[in-house]
Structures are given as C-alpha cells and as structure tokens.
Amino acid sequence: MNEVMVIKEGWLQKRGEYIKTWRPRYFLLKSDGSFIGYKEKPESTEHNVVLPPLNNFSVAECQLMKTERPRPNTFVIRCLQWTTVIERTFHVDTPEEREEWIIAIQTVANGLKNQVPEDEEEEAMEVKYGSPSDVSSAEQMDVAMSKGHPKVTMNDFDYLKLLGKGTFGKVILVREKATGRYYAMKILRKEVIIAKDEVAHTLTESRVLQNTKHPFLTALKYAFQTSDRLCFVMEYANGGELFFHLSRERVFTEDRARFYGAEIVSALEYLHSRNVVYRDIKLENLMLDKDGHVKITDFGLCKEGITDGATMRTFCGTPEYLAPEVLEDNDYGRAVDWWGLGVVMYEMMCGRLPFYNQDHERLFELILMEEIRFPRTLSPEAKSLLAGLLKKDPKQRLGGGPNDAQEVMSHRFFVSINWQDVTERKLTPPFKPQVTSEIDTRYFDDEFTAQSITLTPPDRYDNLDALESDQRPHFPQFSYSASIRE
C-alpha cells in the first residue's frame, strides 16, 4: 500500500458555493486525490494529527478550467458526482501560482488514473442496483462493464415523454424495445462536463456504479455514451413526486408523514453504512412507486438553471433545503441528510417550509439564525423530532452523533414503527397512486409531459459501433449494464 503524501499545500481563496463570497482556506493536495482545506494552516501534518478539515473532496478524474472572472487567476475543478455535475472555484494571486496548482492537481489525477489495474478493467461484475455515490469512495465500489453484454445504444429505446430538463441535460421516459420495460433516461451533454482542448476526462465504472440494492433507492440499469452525450438509464417510479401529492393536499397527517419518513430513514441508513452521503434530500427527489412506496431518485439536473453571469457557473441546489453547515461552506458529513429529512418532514406535517424568503440572502440568514416555529396542531412527538432534525449545529442534531440513523429510528415519534417491516416493504402505504399502467404519467408535471421529445440534433443518435474507442478519448470506459435483467 502506497503511503499517502502531501503533494502541494498553500493558501487558496475558495468561493462559497451558495453565499458567493471568497474565503481563505489552507489546502493540502494529497497523493490519494484528497484535496482538503482548513481555516488555519494546520500546526502539524505529521501522523495526520490535525483538526478535521472544513473542505474535503477528491480531484480524481476531475476537469480543470482556467478563467479570469470573477477574479484574475481563477481556476475551477469540475467533476461528476454520481450523475450530477459539481464545481469548486478557487483563485490565487499570480498566473504562475495558478499554473503550479493546476499541474499538481493534474499530475495527481493522472497518477490515480494509471493505478487502475488492467485486469480490473476486463472483469465483468454483476451490478443489481446503483445509488448516489460519493466521489471519494471510488475504491469501495464494485463495477460492471458492458464486456460480455450486448452494447446498449440510444436506438434500443422508444422516447415517450419529457419528465424534466435543466442546464446540463434532460430526463425522458423511455421504453426498452427488447423488453417493453419503462425507464427514466437521464441524458447529459458531454460538452458541459468536458470542454474542447481540455485534459481528457475519464469516467470509470468504479466512479459511477455502486453495487447497492435497497427498496427505496432508484436503481441504475444502464449507462452508455454517444459522441456528444452521456446516458444513464434508471428505474422509473411513476407514482409521482411527493411534492406533487403534497401540493394537492396541502398537508399530510402525521401517520402518513411517519410512513414516508421511515422509508427515507431506512434508505439513508443504508447509504450512510456504505459511507455515502446523499446530500440532496428534498421533496422533488422523493418519488412514489406504483404501490405508494418511496423511491429516492437521482434525476438532479440543476432545474433552476440560474447562472452567475460573471463565471457562467450554474447555481445547483434548491436553497430552501440547504443545511447551515453547507451555507457556511464548511465540510459536511452525514448530518446534512438528517437536516434534509427534517425539512421534508416539516413540509409534510406543517404544509410549508421551515424557512422561506424569496430573497436568497434573507433566506440564508433565516436558515443560519432563525429559531424553528411549529403550528399548534402538531403533536409533542412531532415537534420534538423536527426540533432535533433541524438543529443548526450538525454535532447537536438528531442523527448527528456516532450512532447516526439509530438516533433517529429510536426517537419516540417512530415508536410504532417496526424497522425490519419497513425495509421489507411490509407496511401498507397510506396512499396508492391511481396509475393504470407503467406508462401512466398523470402524476408528472404537465409542463414537461406535454412537450415533444427533441434531442438536438435529432440525427445524432450515433451508431457507437462506428466510433472506435480511440476516437472518443474523453470517456474510454463509459459503457456498462446491470448484468441481470429482472
């Protein structure tokens, strides 16, 4: 096992992802790809006896971009986290300093790429389910390759309805021609992930597919590429977004909220046990399947499409759901998911968001400072649960301790819940969607389902067989499929 070494260290200005101020951070770039930032220069890096970092992410398989806006000598690190594009923005004082950082980061990223053993690339492994993945846990993931399986292309599907669209791509309801099964296909434009003339950006299966299986997580069936797109084919839950149902009914009973909350907790416990933080719990990411059980989706597309004019950097994330530690640009762990659970359960039981203001600056202030308030109609157990989940300090938050999900599961609000029955889908859903078939999209937004499907340009459903792998160097390994058809 190679010893992890510090390759480069020094002060960088890091731009906040939500509150867009620049904050000085002392960063260490390590040989394992970790890129960690501190408020102060760590006193000692010997024996790794240092305070926990404020920022901690991986530069493995990242794309690097230089820009002179909004400040001179800025650089952006962009990578794909599961199927969502994320960016981090930094600036330094001189072009020479920026060049040093870029070369160091690129050298580390290239070194990691070369460490993938060839026999691992050849091996076909069974993957039943995929789930949102933390970029830093690539080594822990099982992979599935298309070798030994028929190649999947865009021609294998009928394109039925547009389910969502955003800055980086769109999600379409498709039918697999061979099986008649319905899926949601998330299509990302490569150009937003790789710029022309930039360093090759490789997507390996270990990054994208994780061998996870859970009843309340959306499964990934296939991933493949065309010359200009990346395509993720995911399980399709057609009972509608919880957001859709809640907006119709305004508020759910505590029993109904308890049912959905328990299924979300079960899924989060599963992800956390695999060192994956979901980070994006919000009503729009919670679907119901045809039986009325929860499915946590990964259709994230930066729906807002709000772009910062200076950097053309897209604002991703629904600000109402952001946890205080995310706003403060501190590194965040599993507790961020318990905050997200608190927000969605508050919405379900109270019929409104815990913190809201149209002005984002004011909203962020409320999230960071405002005390939570409850309607009089709420039971003491519900108030206690929500107050615990919505604690500002992640260390004090319910679920924020070492016992993680167990703290939430043992809260008295869930006293009537048999957690084994939850995971085995034995609880009767409080609402069964009125869908007549798998293709019934009555619970999806008319704004999308009424639109016709256009993939521009329409004639570029590439025949990938005509493209030799060396002609598409950016994504040489990007095609695989779950090896079992259910």
UniProtKB/Swiss-Prot annotation:
Broad class of enzyme this protein falls into: transferase
GO CC annotation, single: cytoplasm
SUPFAM superfamilies: PH domain-like (SSF50729), Protein kinase-like (PK-like) (SSF56112)
Statement: the UniProt record of this protein carries the keyword Glycoprotein: yes
EC number, UniProt record: 2.7.11.1
Swiss-Prot/TrEMBL catalytic activity: L-seryl-[protein] + ATP = O-phospho-L-seryl-[protein] + ADP + H(+); L-threonyl-[protein] + ATP = O-phospho-L-threonyl-[protein] + ADP + H(+)
Keyword Nucleotide-binding in annotation: yes
Name of this chain's protein: RAC-beta serine/threonine-protein kinase A
Originating species: Xenopus laevis (African clawed frog)
Gene3D superfamilies linked to this entry: Phosphorylase Kinase, domain 1, Pleckstrin-homology domain (PH domain)/Phosphotyrosine-binding domain (PTB), Transferase(Phosphotransferase) domain 1
Segments for region (Disordered): 455-486
An MF annotation (GO) of this entry: protein serine kinase activity
Active-site residues from the entry: 280
InterPro entries the UniProt entry points to: AGC-kinase_C (IPR000961), Akt2 (IPR034677), Kinase-like_dom_sf (IPR011009), PH-like_dom_sf (IPR011993), PH_domain (IPR001849), PH_PKB (IPR039026), Pkinase_C (IPR017892), Prot_kinase_dom (IPR000719)
Activity-regulation annotation: Two specific sites, one in the kinase domain (Thr-314) and the other in the C-terminal regulatory region (Ser-479), need to be phosphorylated for its full activation.
Lineage: Eukaryota, Metazoa, Chordata, Craniata, Vertebrata
Residue positions where Phosphothreonine is found in the record: 314
